[in-house]
Amino acid sequence: MPDKEVKIVEAVPNFSEGRDISKIEKIIDSIKNIEGVKILDLNVDPQHNRSVITFTCGIERIIEAGISMIKTAASLIDMEKHSGLHPRFGATDVFPIIPITASMDDCIIASRNLGRLVGSELNIPVYMYSESAMVPERRNLENIRNKNVQYEELKELIKTDKYRPDFGPDSLGSAGAVIIGARPALIAYNIYISTDDIKIGRRIASALRGRDGGLNTLKTLAFYIEARKMVQISMNITDYKKTSIYKIFELLSIECRRYNVYPVESELIGLMPMDALIDVFNYYMKSNITRDKILEYKIFT
């Protein structure tokens, strides 16, 4: 009998550490010996003091991997001492699980089981979000954690009905809280613009932001990055099939011209689907390339 097909998931946990690489290495080491785990990418950002690890594994191993990473992060990262530009709740800030060959329902079940164990075994408060939300308002991450509600504010808010965790205690330790959920593929994409004026950055970010009347399925924030002496427009594309990267870049360029600034550099945080890149290529090259014209795709499929 052939082996049962493994249901593959991707995980993209975000950790509140971007300055001490040894701590991130220990978090990665905690899952290296788990069967089927493949580390795909690491993005470390000292300004945001945040790291994003991308890995895949069979869905039957995601809970083991999640517990190991969250436990290790809790032992290494003290939120009382943490500072950084990016909003954050805890040592492991957010732990999304994305279906690859598994189904979304599979990922929802796995994420809730992970959340339950993190709460009961690690004694860390857990909020379920996106497709795994157990409270409707928590489907959107911004309704849980945002620039106005972070680790410091959560210390008191966690005792209220609105911020009662889905799992775990209603009090915070030095590891803070973790947000866990199943979600579709997301593209984290940043653009630096030629100004140090954060007010201009915020206006441009608002013009692009979906909830402010900009591009659908686009979430934006503006940060001043001291190391670059520039403003960064930080973006999450929650559905790249509805909101293409080229549309974002073109609209941002138009908005920049209103303030006599221009886009300087783009950066990708984590990984992106091949189809999203092909979409950008086809727009600018006026072509109709499909993935079966990509050499590496033909070789490895």
Curated annotation (Swiss-Prot):
One of its GO terms (molecular function) is 5-formyltetrahydrofolate cyclo-ligase activity. GO terms for biological process: L-histidine catabolic process to glutamate and formamide; L-histidine catabolic process to glutamate and formate; tetrahydrofolate interconversion. One of its GO terms (cellular component) is cytoplasm. It catalyses: (6S)-5-formyl-5,6,7,8-tetrahydrofolate + L-glutamate = N-formyl-L-glutamate + (6S)-5,6,7,8-tetrahydrofolate + H(+); 5-formimidoyltetrahydrofolate + L-glutamate = N-formimidoyl-L-glutamate + (6S)-5,6,7,8-tetrahydrofolate; (6S)-5-formyl-5,6,7,8-tetrahydrofolate + ATP = (6R)-5,10-methenyltetrahydrofolate + ADP + phosphate. Its EC number is 2.1.2.5, 6.3.3.2. Pfam families: FTCD, FTCD_N. Folate binds at residues 168-176. Pathway: Amino-acid degradation; L-histidine degradation into L-glutamate; L-glutamate from N-formimidoyl-L-glutamate (transferase route): step 1/1; One-carbon metabolism; tetrahydrofolate interconversion. It comes from the Archaea. SUPFAM superfamilies: Formiminotransferase domain of formiminotransferase-cyclodeaminase. Keywords: Cytoplasm, Folate-binding, Histidine metabolism, Ligase, Transferase. It is found in: Cytoplasm. The active site is at residue 86. Belongs to the formiminotransferase family. Catalyzes the transfer of the formyl group from N-formylglutamate to tetrahydrofolate (THF) to yield 5-formyltetrahydrofolate (5-CHO-THF) and glutamate (Glu). The triglutamate form of 5-CHO-THF (5-CHO-THF-Glu3) can also be used as substrate. It can also catalyze the transfer of the formimino group from N-formiminoglutamate to tetrahydrofolate (THF) to yield 5-formiminotetrahydrofolate (5-NH=CH-THF) and glutamate (Glu). It can replace YgfA to catalyze the irreversible ATP-dependent transformation of 5-CHO-THF to form 5,10-methenyltetrahydrofolate (5,10-CH=THF). This is Glutamate formimidoyltransferase.
